[in-house]
Amino acid sequence: MAAFSLIEIMFVLGAAATVSAVAVPETLATIDDSRTAAAARYAATRLQRTRMDAVTRSNIVAVRFSLVSSHYEFAGYQDGNRNGVLSRDIQSGVDRLVQPADRLGDHFPGVEFCAIPNLPAVDSTSTAPGTDPIRLGSSDIVSFTPSGTSSSGSLYICGRRKTQYVVRIYGETGKTRILKFNTGSGQWLPASEL
């Protein structure tokens, strides 16, 4: 019957602890990246759903982002008086709610609309987000038309470990594109290439 000495057992336990200490942070970073990427896809899908709502309803439908208790909520509204979805029309009830309020953190723990400090602009045609992760103009509304076009803008999304993604909305087509910020190179890369 083979037996192990106390020194052999301590060596094996020490090696296992070292491997675990190295692997756990990398595993947590991978989980955070996956969760943040999924949240970016979720946000892009919600925008595309709103675009399809506008086409099928033959009316302008928009997503409004609101800061509530330090977290952003987003909800869909349909134009009620043919002048576009406006904040004052939402408040007065003219533009009615068609998609209930939602929060990224409710589906993806630790993920929010945010921008890490000193984040560069996505490209030469845009500005850096600074402290505003919702780059849709002063109203924080992205509108989609019955012809499939939209207003343009960017939504910055980050996770607990500062994994950074952006959902870009292109006005001429109403389509979205997801990019990830590579901290090593300091560049934005298409999420589809990662």
Please give the residue ranges for each predicted region.
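Glycine-rich phosphate-binding loop
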Residues: 1
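N-terminal helix-rich module
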Residues: 4-11, 18, 22-48, 52, ...
